[in-house]
Amino acid sequence: MWRRIFAHELKYDQPNASSKNLILSVLNTTATKREAKDYLSKYTNDSGQHNHCLFFIRDLHKVAPAILSQFSSVIKRLGMLGLRPMFVIPPSPTHVNIQAELLDSIVTEADLKPLHLKEGLTKSRTGLYHSVFSQESRFFDIGNSNFIPIVKPYVYNEETASEFMTKDVVKFMDCLCQGNIPHIDKFFILNNAGGIPSGERNDNAHVFINLSQELEHLSSSLSHNISTLTKREPRSQNLLHRMEVYVKKDEISSLECEYHDHLENLLLMDKVLSNLAATATGLITTVKAAALSSDRKNPLVYNLLTDRSLISSSLPRFKKKDGEIDSPANMFDDHAWYELPSQQVNAAPSNSDAVLVTTVLKKGVHIKTYDYKTLTQFNSIGLPKKFHVPEKGAKPSSNSPKLDINKFKSIIDQSFKRSLDLHDYIKRINGKIATIIVIGDYEGIAILTYEGSEENSFVYLDKFAVLPHLKGSLGISDIIFNLMFKKFPNEILWRSRKDNVVNKWYFQRSVAVLDLSIDLDPEHCDEKQSQFKLFYYGNPQYAKRALRDKKRLREFMRSVRDIKPSWENEKNIS
């Protein structure tokens, strides 16, 4: 955090020709087949659902007119793609009317009709709040789709017949999105600072946030940063550091306000998304990024079409620099060990500005981790009796989380489209389980084990599965890999069939890949045909050491290569 200071007409019934061309163009360039299918099922006429996006834009009056004009074109494009915008103005003692005028111009320039609604909420005599979105539902009928609501942050009090500007915008937005409201599929917060900052990404924005998992930690971290800035304490008692605090006082004040907004944005996202469908998505970015004309670079359009961020959140934050790690390819004759160069991640991509300032959020899924080295009847449900252990001493607490073996097997069977030999598999992993990660109600799962010699073991991703209908959605794969990398930051290995269509995705998340068919030890003819590739993820320190250690590499490769699959009728494949 301190580095930043101390370092220098809307139609839904039949799209016109330009709209069709736009849809085809964008789908051809940004979406996978699954994403295209999901988009078409949700946003075309046949879905029978009118989709809306809710905008909350901070400091719109500070944005250059040229950017506002470009943003107007994006609003028009979103409408063509089936997403009707609605705007809520943030409370401000001086700028509400100015922002209302600017939004009026933006909507008008997009060939739409602004509909100004002064009171977003009505407080009844009983103390209950009622949203204008539910009270004025007639404005959201398909026949009125050209009318774009612009809601001011006022509350009308029925008991006193008066209105007042809200002082609690989080509560205001929470109440606004309750009740029988239109279907809101996206919640966009635009500002000048961008998404929620991440220390792991050099204070650039988090790529993806699973609120169910990360809200408490992130809100605590932001609150701590605010507290630190408020104290105005120097980095040390050194005279220069004390002078820095005085000289940079305006920047510190500005950053403090910025972090207050970040915390408020996070809480806004949590409250609003809690009131919407589980599939709803939140996105925080800058107005400048939201105004980009390129469909590949614009985070709003890209998220509408794919329901994900511009880049994946589970991509490694480090890669080897050229010449930093000696390539071990020459150790194994002409068989190559592939390493991703540093520019794949660290160099600015073509859409770098938007990537670095955009955070995508989901209310998300609950996550459970089972750190049991051995599965027993006391920490699991449905475990075959042959794996039961004698009860010794005090009986384990019945409140401790238990792994559901039936669901465990079911998700693996469905994901891999083959039947797991449960007895054989548990026999193989029991006693050396590193962790088991379960997403939601067994919608995603990862089983990690310790492999290799006991004195020099390594973490191995033995099974990674997502229910077929959820692959590519909710960021489940990214959530699992992020958890793995955080839990085991030094190194993780996994293998995949050579013809696996997911290998490109795996390749992007590894720092090295090896064909397991190579001769591991030419002197002793240790060569076997294998249908697998080995993927290696490691931080720079571990990777540098491992990739130079021929003995360690052979241990990796031999251990992973010789693991026998535990599928029924498929025991002899290697």
Curated annotation (Swiss-Prot):
Gene3D superfamilies, per the entry: 3.40.630.30
Record comment: activity regulation: Feedback inhibition by L-arginine.
Primary localization: mitochondrion
Activity vs pH: Optimum pH is 8.5-9.5.
UniProt KW Transmembrane keyword: no
Entry keyword set: Acyltransferase, Amino-acid biosynthesis, Mitochondrion, Transferase, Transit peptide
Domain N-acetyltransferase per the UniProt entry, residue ranges: 392-560
One GO cellular component term: NAGS/NAGK complex
Keyword Isomerase: no
GO molecular function, one term: L-glutamate N-acetyltransferase activity
Localization per record: Mitochondrion
Pathway the protein acts in: Amino-acid biosynthesis; L-arginine biosynthesis; N(2)-acetyl-L-ornithine from L-glutamate: step 1/4
Transit peptide boundaries: 1-13
InterPro entries from the UniProt entry: GlcNAc_Synth_fun, Vertebrate-like_GNAT_dom
EC identifiers of the protein: 2.3.1.1
Catalytic reactions of this protein: L-glutamate + acetyl-CoA = N-acetyl-L-glutamate + CoA + H(+)
The protein's assembly and partners: Interacts with the acetylglutamate kinase chain of AGR5,6.
Function per UniProt: N-acetylglutamate synthase involved in arginine biosynthesis.
PANTHER family linked to this entry: AMINO-ACID ACETYLTRANSFERASE, MITOCHONDRIAL, N-ACETYLGLUTAMATE SYNTHASE
Family: Belongs to the acetyltransferase family.
Protein name per the record: Amino-acid acetyltransferase, mitochondrial
Organism field: Saccharomyces cerevisiae (strain ATCC 204508 / S288c) (Baker's yeast)
